[in-house]
Amino acid sequence: MVMTQRIAVLGATGSIGDSTLAILAAQPQYYDVYALSGYHRLDKLLALCQQFAPKRVGVPTTAVDDFAKRLSAAGLDIEVVGGDAGLVDIATDSQTDTVVAAIVGAAGLPSTLAAARAGKRILLANKEALVMAGQVMINAVKTHHATLLPLDSEHNAIFQCLPFAIQQDNTQIHRSNHGVRKLWLTASGGPFLQQSFTQMQQASVAEAVKHPNWSMGQKISVDSATMMNKGLELIEACHLFDLPENKINVVIHPQSIIHSMVEYSDGSFLAQLGSPDMKTPIAHALSYPDRIDSGSQPLDLFALNGLEFIEPDLQKFACLRLAREAMQAGTHATIILNAANEIAVSAFLNNKIRLTDIADINEQALNEIQVPLLTETADIDEILAIDNLARQYTDKLVARLA
């Protein structure tokens, strides 16, 4: 790498933002932080602006004026933009080379899709962009010659294990021509792997967000506890790698050392191993097709005491089953599932429902919400309309339990 990449980190104050910015700070010869965005943690965002001095920063619309004053008081000359429109403007800015799409949830969809339509290099951590708008997103990447590189450790691992020809253009090459039989997504099993369903019913928020291997935000930690995170990743993998859900298996691997695998027709399994540190897949995507130092601790093979592989219990982890069923049903169902899950997880984090109620609410939403089927040419307004309807309906489901 010789040219400096100008990076926009959307969702800079979250855990993915932390890991990304740690790498960017250590590699100033390769990367220039052009823009940042944040939503809740504006004090942290201000500190990041002081550290990296971006040209632009995105905040909630209601915070634009106040944040601009705070930047000015700190002696910083940074343009402040607000809301979804501001994020879209940053994502499509001609000065932006690479967009790190790390906004959590459906809120990240408009800016990620806009980046694809602007032909940007996109480092995708926001799985909802593909869960909600998979074919629309992939079509935009193809049509506008954008680049889409996965940041999720599992999808990044699969990407690394695929033949180079597929890495270069996974939208045009049939995997059968390269001997790919199946993809294997690994899952840690979360904090309740060894506990019964009855014990899960009594789980506190503090217990649910305490992941055994990874340091993550609250929402994704709860999704890991219910295995909805793996369900969303299964849907994402179908779109990213252009495979039906029956070609993608999920296996629980409690040590989180093997991050995913590709099974080939000759009987070979190619696996990507590494310490459970998000800086590794982020560094890979930032520098692809080259390699840079991620700053993570290398894996000590001699310290490993064995690797386990366990078939998921789909009664205990019903969210994983629901994700597969939603993928079979179509995009309208994956939108409903994602929206319902976001509302249900928020309710759990606010102590309104039990952890195990999340799957029940998700299943009710999938079974009861009636919406038109979406075509591959659906626009973002149609997608967001279903998302909004599902959220309103799920709010009512939560209210019945709260």
Curated annotation (Swiss-Prot):
GO biological-process terms attached to the record: isopentenyl diphosphate biosynthetic process, methylerythritol 4-phosphate pathway involved in terpenoid biosynthetic process
Cofactor: Mg(2+); Mn(2+)
Binding site for Mn(2+): 152, 154, 233
Ligand binding (1-deoxy-D-xylulose 5-phosphate): 127, 153-154, 188, 211, 224, 229-230, 233
Keywords linked to the UniProt accession: Isoprene biosynthesis, Manganese, Metal-binding, NADP, Oxidoreductase
Molecular-function annotations in GO: 1-deoxy-D-xylulose-5-phosphate reductoisomerase activity; manganese ion binding; NADPH binding
Role: Catalyzes the NADPH-dependent rearrangement and reduction of 1-deoxy-D-xylulose-5-phosphate (DXP) to 2-C-methyl-D-erythritol 4-phosphate (MEP).
PANTHER family: 1-DEOXY-D-XYLULOSE 5-PHOSPHATE REDUCTOISOMERASE, 1-DEOXY-D-XYLULOSE 5-PHOSPHATE REDUCTOISOMERASE, CHLOROPLASTIC
Protein name: 1-deoxy-D-xylulose 5-phosphate reductoisomerase
